[in-house]
A protein has these predicted regions:
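N-terminal non-catalytic structural scaffold regions of very large proteins
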Residues: 1-210
């Protein structure tokens, strides 16, 4: 079959899985040479195939090209630093209005300097509201432990010297993971910036499982 060279985007129209979930794909057709396909599976792992042969994690392709897993994370994701504050038992980070583009509700947010609650739990807040807070001088904030749930590590975190003593890039944070990190006396985390609109964690979870 002959097709014009180019990059083609498509999905399976929900026919692959019983849930009807749309599985997106991309095909790269060069002027000469092998076709390269990228596709998601139902678990949102990202794969590639050459000439429609066996699918392999997309991160494997990048690793073969000389990237490290950290370099892949740095290339495709921005990151934010969170530091645990033993006094308040909350996590300190920079206030970034961009984080509120993808949601209109919020966790509790405290001004790290004044210790004033500037956003109450469950308050509706959007980018414009967040931008106003930043313009009014809000820089560093404290957020609860629960606010980190569902976020993903941007760098490996080694908690001990055992074979499974490292939480790797792409590990999803939950209460148990955070507690093990704190028990190892590690109080600073680098976390990838993801959202539900245009920066999903799919490549991070692919890296983790590669």
């Amino acid at each position: 079959m002959h097709r014009s060279p180019g990059v083609f985007f498509d999905h399976d129209k929900g026919k692959t899985h019983a849930s009807g979930k749309l599985l997106f794909n991309c095909r790269v057709i060069p002027n000469r040479g092998s076709w390269l396909d990228f596709e998601y599976d139902v678990k949102d792992f990202l794969y590639f195939k050459i000439d429609r042969k066996k699918k392999i994690f997309a991160s494997t392709l990048l690793l073969a090209l000389g990237f490290t897993k950290l370099e892949i994370a740095d290339e495709f994701y921005e990151s934010e630093q969170f530091t645990f504050d033993p006094k308040t038992e909350k996590w300190k980070t920079k206030f970034n209005p961009e984080n509120y583009k993808a949601k209109n509700f919020s966790e509790e947010v405290t001004n790290a300097k004044t210790e004033e609650v500037v956003i109450k739990l469950g308050d509706k807040i959007n980018f414009l509201n967040a931008k106003k807070l930043a313009n009014d001088g809000l820089k560093d904030i404290l957020v609860t432990r629960e606010s980190l749930f569902g976020k993903f590590l941007h760098r490996d975190v080694k908690i001990n010297d055992e074979a499974e003593g490292t939480f790797s890039i792409g590990t999803e944070l939950n209460d148990a993971v955070i507690q093990q990190i704190l028990d190892a006396n590690i109080h600073t985390l680098q976390i990838s910036v993801t959202n539900s609109i245009n920066k999903g964690p799919y490549l991070l979870t692919t890296i983790l499982n590669d």
